[in-house]
């Protein structure tokens, strides 16, 4: 009986020693079974912003809108076509019905000034709208960028766990073959290892999907990925105050109101009179006089004459309707601005609460659970090697470690997303 106990103890020590040797071997990290590499050129977030500013189709369309508005400013001084009339009446002498007439109609000068101011205000509104598009695009890029970092960090965690599970799957197999455990323990270890690799495949697929989204946002065919190696929290600065009037959205709405004010003034110029100017020059064809009219009194040469006319708007019902319609447009835009301001201020309060909750959660995992999870993993590994705990207890410890690491990654990601949302609202992207 003593000989059998000694033999059992010896076998236990051999298995434990061999398991310890396996733990000291270099970690394969599942490299032979799973390719976790993500192809692509490494780029920083600022490089993504710069690339999108040049290549993104939304930005290009916004720039074209600004250019169009700038070109339209040249239409402010549009004049009616100059009318040129030639008349020749052989039945008269050298009167005004024998000559050239140049006629030009034009609006009152204030009309052109108002129109020019309106077009300049519309150009500024287009520039503000482009800034809104830029801020929104930057927020989308930053969101995708940090989501890629988050998923890459999760993949790193799963790779480390894969190494541990693969080693202990081998240990469970040896213990089963040595008769120290049942086959169920080995099968459970192998299942855990395979499930972890399936999770790794899902995470890698999500990274590749996010990479495609980022490429679309940058409008590039070249695969790109974040330059950072580790997932870190974004440095949050000056996020405690929010002024809608100073945000990109607020400035755009204010510029729209200014443009509509200018439009109202331009519509009111319809009440102003119009002007017309005519210049006439004598043109008598001396060789063509079928009625033998005496033209001797016009023999001293040609003469010039002019005419100035003023158009008075006696029927101005259409102009009044245009002014009222422009005023309604302005009232509607003001209501929309107040509505947007209410929504943005509400969103800021919600984002602030979200950021505070994410910050508290992040501090908790950074101060306590990181070291705690590492200690659990280390102690459970030693105890399992020495046969002090069962594989089920060890797996529970591993799952607790994974849970803590993943929750810490979730906390960083949630914090970063909250910061990005506030930066988008405040226009600090």
PLM segments and residue spans:
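Bacterial N-terminal signal peptides
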Residues: 15-26
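Amphipathic alpha-helical coiled-coil scaffold segments and their short linker/junction regions
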Residues: 41-55, 186, 190, 220-284, ...
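Amphipathic alpha-helical coiled-coil segments
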Residues: 61-76, 133, 137-156, 174, ...
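Short, charged, amphipathic alpha-helical segments
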Residues: 117-120, 183-192, 324, 391-399
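Small/polar, glycine/serine/threonine/aspartate-rich low-complexity segments that form flexible
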Residues: 32-42, 79-118, 278-318
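A glycine-/polar-enriched beta->alpha junction
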Residues: 50-61, 67-81, 100-118, 128-135, ...
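Acidic, low-complexity, intrinsically disordered peripheral segments
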Residues: 2-10, 16, 30-37, 407-429
């Amino acid at each position: 009986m003593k000989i059998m106990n000694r033999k059992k103890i010896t076998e236990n020590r051999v298995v434990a020693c061999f398991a310890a040797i396996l733990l000291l071997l270099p970690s394969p990290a599942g490299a032979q079974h799973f390719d976790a590499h993500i192809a692509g050129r490494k780029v920083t977030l600022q490089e993504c912003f710069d690339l999108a500013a040049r290549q993104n189709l939304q930005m290009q369309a916004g720039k074209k809108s600004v250019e169009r508005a700038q070109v339209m400013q040249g239409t402010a001084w549009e004049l009616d076509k100059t009318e040129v009339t030639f008349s020749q009446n052989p039945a008269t002498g050298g009167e005004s019905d024998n000559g050239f007439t140049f006629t030009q109609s034009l609006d009152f000068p204030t009309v052109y000034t108002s129109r020019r101011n309106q077009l300049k205000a519309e150009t500024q509104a287009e520039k503000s709208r482009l800034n809104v598009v830029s801020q929104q695009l930057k927020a989308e890029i930053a969101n995708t960028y940090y989501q890629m970092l988050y998923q890459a960090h999760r993949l790193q965690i799963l790779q480390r766990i894969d190494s541990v599970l693969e080693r202990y799957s081998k240990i469970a197999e040896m213990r089963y073959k040595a008769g120290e455990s049942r086959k169920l323990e080995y099968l459970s270890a192998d299942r855990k290892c395979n499930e972890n690799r399936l999770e790794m495949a899902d995470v890698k697929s999500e990274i590749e999907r996010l990479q495609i989204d980022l490429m679309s946002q940058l409008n590039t065919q070249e695969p790109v990925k974040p330059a950072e190696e580790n997932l870190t929290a974004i440095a949050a600065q000056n996020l405690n105050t929010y002024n809608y009037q100073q945000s990109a959205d607020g400035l755009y709405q204010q510029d729209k109101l200014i443009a509509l004010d200018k439009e109202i003034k331009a519509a009111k110029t319809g009440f102003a009179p119009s002007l017309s100017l005519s210049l006439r020059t004598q043109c008598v064809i001396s060789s063509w006089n079928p009625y033998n009219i005496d033209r001797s009194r016009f023999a001293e040469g040609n003469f010039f004459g002019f005419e100035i006319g003023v158009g008075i708007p006696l029927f101005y019902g259409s102009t009044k309707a245009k002014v009222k319609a422009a005023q309604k447009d302005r009232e509607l835009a003001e209501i929309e601005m107040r509505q947007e301001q209410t929504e943005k201020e509400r969103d800021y309060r919600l984002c602030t609460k979200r950021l505070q909750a994410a910050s508290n959660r992040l501090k908790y995992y950074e101060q306590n659970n990181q070291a705690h999870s590492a200690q659990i993993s280390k102690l459970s590994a030693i105890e399992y090697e020495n046969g002090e705990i069962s594989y089920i207890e060890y797996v529970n410890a591993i799952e607790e470690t994974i849970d803590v690491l993943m929750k810490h990654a979730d906390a960083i990601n949630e914090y970063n997303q909250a910061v990005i949302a506030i930066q988008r609202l405040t226009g600090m992207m």
